[in-house]
Regions:
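Basic/aromatic recognition patch in beta-strand/loop cores that engages polyanionic ligands
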Residues: 50-82
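Basic, Lys/Arg-enriched alpha-helical interface segments
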Residues: 2-60, 96-98, 104-105
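Enriched for short, Lys/Arg-rich terminal
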Residues: 69-73, 77-105
């Protein structure tokens, strides 16, 4: 299995998602379920990274892949040794509005 590297922005995304679930729905159990689903999805793509859907954007220099975990898209790239998780978005979010074009930073 490849090493999993979480970019700071992806960590902040997940922290925000889990905080929102706890505060909005008052459900730590639902937040834990979401965290588990995201973690399991990342572990699966670390084993088989080609399973994620290709995602290319004209504004981005590299091609990314994405995988769905519950209602969240996880955007990642990979090489022979590493999976890099770049962002995690709710499916209803406008990715351009939320800085997807700034992944390279």
């Amino acid at each position: 299995m490849r090493e999993i590297v979480w970019r700071p922005r992806a960590v902040a995304d997940v922290d925000g998602i889990l905080s929102y679930i706890v505060l909005e729905y008052r459900s730590p159990k639902a937040a834990q379920s979401c965290a588990d689903a995201i973690s399991q999805a990342v572990e699966r793509v670390a084993e088989l990274p080609e399973t994620g859907r290709l995602f290319a954007d004209d504004d981005l220099e590299r091609t990314y892949r994405r995988v769905l975990a519950k209602n969240y898209w996880i955007y990642y790239s990979y090489d022979a040794d590493t999976i890099t998780v770049w962002r995690v978005f709710h499916t209803s979010q406008d990715h351009d509005t939320y800085g997807f074009a700034l992944l390279e930073e």
